[in-house]
Amino acid sequence: MLKPAIMYKDEIKKQMQKYFYTDDMMYEVGELDNYVPEIADEPDRYCFQYAIVDSNEKLIGYLAYAIDWHASCAYNFGLFSFDRGNPIVGKELFGKMEELVHKFHRIEWRMVGGNPVEKSYDRFCAKYNGTKHILKDAFKDRNCEYRDYIIYEIINEENK
């Protein structure tokens, strides 16, 4: 279930800090930096931040995205699972993305190649006749291996 992230602000920060200097953090940030989201006490109309919780209200993930209302575009998605393999995280992510595909003209998101969620993103993108762009060898990871940047876009022609 999605809850406003402000309700779990401190817990989200602590969970994110556990992943500093890891590949999981690289997949979240898209580079070698570490990151803790700045969760707004009073969110504006452009940024949406959610805690993903299970039926016991236990924090299992974090989801954020931005909206460009003028362009009718949802973008800048960020997802972090604190409970690897928990299907609720994927269910909530793709449920929200599905909602946004039908509400806006365009949604776009990026990821680092090799991210375990890539096949799920590919299926979701294909379901809505989206496009996957690959920027080959876009940066080097901590092991000096090249990684691709992948950009997904889905255009809903009915929402212009």
Locate the predicted segments by residue:
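A short, well-structured alpha-helix characteristic of acyl/acetyltransferase catalytic modules
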Residues: 1-40, 147, 158-160
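Acetyl-CoA-dependent GNAT
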Residues: 27-74, 80-85
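Conserved beta strand-loop-helix elements of the APE1-like EEP
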Residues: 152-157
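Conserved catalytic-core motifs of GNAT/GCN5-like acyltransferases
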Residues: 127-147
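Short, high-confidence coil segments that cap the C-terminus of an alpha-helix
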Residues: 47, 103-106
